[in-house]
């Protein structure tokens, strides 16, 4: 990529398929995306954030074994119309050590 696109080697960041979108920030930080952006913008590079609370959230999300089933009755067929509801239920499940399985009811 660096040879054909005139991009510095340290600015090539691999966007991998991950099990969850919530793992993307940790993956990008591990590859140095934050440092590369600050360097390109001419900003001072300080201490790398530890992302402790974020990693704790991921650990809780990944270790949850109990499942709670929720039926969601909605007006629209397109499930994206209920994205915020799905995400908020998912977050609530994570903080209560549960995986949330949502069944859409038409």
Residue ranges and their predicted role:
Residues 1-106:
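N-terminal beta1-alpha1 cap of cysteine-dependent amidohydrolase-like domains
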């Amino acid at each position: 990529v660096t040879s054909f696109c005139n991009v510095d080697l340290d600015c090539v960041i691999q966007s991998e398929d991950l099990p969850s979108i919530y793992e993307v920030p940790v993956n990008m930080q591990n590859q140095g995306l934050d440092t590369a952006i600050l360097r390109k913008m001419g900003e001072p590079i300080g201490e790398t954030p530890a992302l402790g609370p974020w990693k704790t959230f991921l650990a809780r999300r990944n270790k949850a074994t109990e499942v709670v089933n929720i039926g969601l009755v909605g007006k629209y067929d397109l499930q994206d119309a209920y994205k915020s509801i799905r995400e908020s239920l998912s977050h609530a499940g994570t903080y209560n050590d549960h995986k949330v399985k949502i069944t859409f009811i038409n």
